[in-house]
């Protein structure tokens, strides 16, 4: 079964990636992703300067997924830019992904200008959706600000750019955000980031399980798959065909990957399950996806991608 895919001018061996934030903080972790069976990998979301992130404990595995309030810990944009530029020289045929986010409007502009002015030629993921910065609202929930920011960005940014979105829950919001995104030459939309401000409780101890924000944190894993599929489907129906979709949320097995693709995703990112299982997860997911395709008689992804049937 052929599970390869074309994306941003490159042919990838399969549709699988890590989600930024998982197993991609250090050179060692990124090298492990590069050596894995993932079709591509994205670096940790970088800020202009290194960040420690929120207080620990800030991540907790639950029976159905995870809750986290990491607070964007990272080693700074220079670290990840230098790493990807070095790989670019060593493996020029490889598709590379950076991920960036500023702490405010000005930092978002500044960090993208830094990428624009660098030697880096790969794809940049602009994170508009971190739910775990105390006192900082998610940019993408402010439609007017999102449009203003992207308008300014595309006055100078000429390299491939995608955006990572939070989950939306209202049809009117899908309509409004898609209308904004369709105005810009985006390579892709990544949907979804974790569902913000969930609460998981240890009933034996009668306390929360993570420290930041009084225990409130972003949900991942099986909890979020129906919401992720809905967002992938909604944007697949609304975005112009030039804007691809990366589906993220709730990937535990090949069936989950298949469903994201069926809803219209071109690539699929794995977060919680990668954290729990390690980079070997990609080999398992690829095998399970191929088994599903074989059972259904599909020989390539494009035979079923985006072809979810309605009743």
Swiss-Prot record:
Main location: cytoplasm
Record's cofactor remark: Binds 1 FMN per subunit.
Pathway assignment: Pyrimidine metabolism; UMP biosynthesis via de novo pathway
Subcellular location(s) of the protein: Cytoplasm
Domain of life assignment: Bacteria
One Gene Ontology term of the molecular function aspect: dihydroorotate dehydrogenase (fumarate) activity
Reactions performed catalytically: (S)-dihydroorotate + fumarate = orotate + succinate
Entry EC no(s): 1.3.98.1
Oligomeric form and interacting partners: Homodimer.
Function: Catalyzes the conversion of dihydroorotate to orotate with fumarate as the electron acceptor.
Protein family (similarity comment): Belongs to the dihydroorotate dehydrogenase family. Type 1 subfamily.
Stated name of the protein: Probable dihydroorotate dehydrogenase A (fumarate)
């Amino acid at each position: 079964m052929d599970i390869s895919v074309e994306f941003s001018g490159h042919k990838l061996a399969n549709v699988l990636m890590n989600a930024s934030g998982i197993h991609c903080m250090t050179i060692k972790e990124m090298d492990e992703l590069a050596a894995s069976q993932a079709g591509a990998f994205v670096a940790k979301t970088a800020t202009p300067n290194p960040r420690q992130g929120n207080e620990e404990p800030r991540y907790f595995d639950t029976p159905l997924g995870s809750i986290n309030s990491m607070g964007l810990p990272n080693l700074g944009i220079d670290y990840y830019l230098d790493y990807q530029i070095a790989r670019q020289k060593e493996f020029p045929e490889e598709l590379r992904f950076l991920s960036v986010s500023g702490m405010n409007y000005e930092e978002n502009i500044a960090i993208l200008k830094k990428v624009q002015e660098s030697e880096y030629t790969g794809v940049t993921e602009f994170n508009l959706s971190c739910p775990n910065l105390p006192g900082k609202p998610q940019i993408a929930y402010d439609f007017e600000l999102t449009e203003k920011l992207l308008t300014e960005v595309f006055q100078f940014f000429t390299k491939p750019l995608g955006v990572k979105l939070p989950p939306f829950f209202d049809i009117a919001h899908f309509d409004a955000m898609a209308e904004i995104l369709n105005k810009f030459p985006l390579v892709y939309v990544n949907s979804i980031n974790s569902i913000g401000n969930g609460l998981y409780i240890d009933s034996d101890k009668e306390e929360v399980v993570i420290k930041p924000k009084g225990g409130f944190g972003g949900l991942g894993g099986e909890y979020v798959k129906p919401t992720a599929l809905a967002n992938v489907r909604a944007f697949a129906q609304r975005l112009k065909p030039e804007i691809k979709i990366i589906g993220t949320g709730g990937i535990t097995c090949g069936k989950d990957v298949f469903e994201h693709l069926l809803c219209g995703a071109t690539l699929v990112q794995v977060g919680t399950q990668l954290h729990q299982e390690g980079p070997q997860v990609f080999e398992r997911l690829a095998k399970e996806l191929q088994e599903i395709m074989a059972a259904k008689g599909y020989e390539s992804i494009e035979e079923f991608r985006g072809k979810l049937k309605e009743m």
